[in-house]
Structures are given as structure tokens and as C-alpha cells.
Design a protein with these regions (language model features):
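Macromolecular interaction modules
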Residues: 19-258
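Bacterial N-terminal signal peptides that target proteins for export
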Residues: 1-7
Length: 258
């Protein structure tokens, strides 16, 4: 009880002080700081190589160690390596792998791309990416959240082609499509959503794709269950209403070792 009395007395003193005539009212609290800039990324989508076994051997034994050795110089803060397993409808995957380097913002990304370390990593691609690749930069358009790790983490991703009307796409995407995804989240069972928008190809030309959306699941079994739900069907049925440029839908998993 003593602590309560002391607290009450202190409160009365504050009120009395604030009530004295002639004194200016307390200043308004400072405005909250602006939100941090969106995270930026470089992504490489590998096309199917001529020899997948040779690709994997070089990728893990030489290329990934090279990128890791240059990490501090390039300045990326996280890396995500994934492998596509199939298209969403069960056919052979349209692409083979995807690698993403994350940066704090676009300024840090542009600085990293200009380093000798990044040039060394880029020059190495021709040594194993025999099927070709698509390299793009962009920004995440939703809040970052923790990512499950480990080779069992599965995902479904949609790569949107450039739409006929970008403004109309964005309006419908934000106002209608994303709420449908959110409403079905519990039923679908994904653990994380990642939304990204491509700014350009790495060489400065127009981006090969417009946007990418990924839903992550704990494992392939959870993904299979989730993509079989009525809620996921509702998400899929909504795509033709705004993705008028076409899209590629794939399933895959994270990889951290050969």
C-alpha cells in the first residue's frame, strides 16, 4: 500500500504543477520516425542446366563458397537458396533454381553491385549456369518476417509477367487479392508470405518479370495440404482477374547444402 500512496502523491504533484496559471502546456510528443526503407534484393533465376549434376557440384563446391567469401565486401545481409521441384500443376519446373541476396536498402544494393567482389561472383556464373539465367533487382513490398530454415522448408511462388496496366494490377492486388490471401491464411497453413516487386534486370534493361509472391510452409507435406484447400483455390481463381500478363507458378524448397 505504501507504494500506491507514494505513486498517488507523485501524480498529484504533477497535476498541480501542470495546473499553475501562466505556464505553457507540455509540448506535443515528437512524431514517430519514418518507416525504414524497404529491403532490396538481387535475385538470379537459373534456367534448367544442360547437366544438373555438374551444376550442383560446381554450385556448392565453388560458387557458393566464392559468394560467401565476398559477403562482407558486397554487403548483403542474408542469402536464400532455393530449388524448384515442379510447376504448381505438377509438371516439370519452368526454372531450375533461384538465389536471392538481401540488402538493407537499394542504396546498399547498388553499392554492393559495384564492388570487385560482386564482379568476381558474377564472372563465375558462366562456369556452371549452362542453361542461362535471369538476374533482376527489386524491393520487398511487405514487412520482413523471420524465415524458417532448413531443407524441409517448402514454398509456392508466383512469378508475375509484366501486366498490361501496372496501376490497375497494383490497385486490385492491394485492395482485393492480398485480402483474399490473408483471409485464407489459417486454412492454407503457410508460415510466412514474401511479396516483392522487380525494378529492373541486372544489366539495366526492363525487368523480365513484374512481381513475385511466395508462401512458405514447414515442409512439402504441409504445402501439399495447403494447396489442396478451398481457401487456396479461391486465391488461385482470383489470379486471372488482375494478372493479365500471365504468370508462372512453381513449388520448391530451401536448400542449404548439396
Amino acid at each position: 500500500m505504501r507504494h500506491l500512496h507514494l505513486l498517488s502523491a507523485a501524480a498529484l504533484l504533477v497535476v498541480a504543477a501542470c495546473s499553475k496559471g501562466g505556464e505553457k502546456p507540455a509540448a506535443e510528443p515528437p512524431a514517430p520516425p519514418p518507416p525504414p526503407p524497404p529491403m532490396a534484393f538481387l535475385t538470379i533465376i537459373y534456367h534448367t542446366p544442360k547437366d544438373a549434376k555438374a551444376f550442383e557440384k560446381y554450385y556448392w563446391a565453388t560458387h557458393i563458397p566464392l559468394v560467401q567469401a565476398k559477403a562482407a565486401e558486397i554487403g548483403f545481409t542474408a542469402v536464400e537458396l532455393t530449388k524448384f521441384d515442379a510447376t504448381l500443376d505438377g509438371k516439370a519446373p519452368t526454372f531450375y533454381r533461384q538465389a536471392v541476396l538481401w540488402f538493407p536498402d537499394m542504396t546498399a544494393l547498388e553499392k554492393g553491385l559495384a564492388t570487385p567482389g560482386f564482379k568476381a561472383a558474377g564472372d563465375d556464373l558462366a562456369n556452371f549456369a549452362t542453361g542461362g539465367l535471369t538476374a533482376m533487382v527489386g524491393e520487398q513490398t511487405n514487412d520482413a518476417s523471420p524465415l524458417l530454415s532448413g531443407d524441409t522448408t517448402a514454398f509456392v511462388t508466383v512469378l508475375y509477367n509484366n501486366p498490361k496496366d501496372g496501376a490497375a494490377f497494383e490497385s486490385y492486388y492491394a485492395a482485393t487479392h492480398l485480402p483474399i490471401v490473408g483471409q485464407g491464411a489459417a486454412e492454407i497453413g503457410f508460415t510466412r508470405a514474401e511479396l516483392a516487386k522487380f525494378a529492373r534486370n541486372l544489366d539495366g534493361s526492363a525487368a523480365a518479370f513484374y512481381r513475385q509472391a511466395k508462401l512458405y510452409f514447414p515442409n512439402a507435406a504441409a504445402l501439399k495440404t495447403g494447396t489442396g484447400t478451398a481457401a487456396f483455390k479461391a486465391v488461385g481463381d482470383d489470379l486471372p482477374k488482375f494478372a493479365d500478363g500471365g504468370l508462372t507458378a512453381l513449388v520448391g524448397h530451401l536448400t542449404s547444402a548439396p
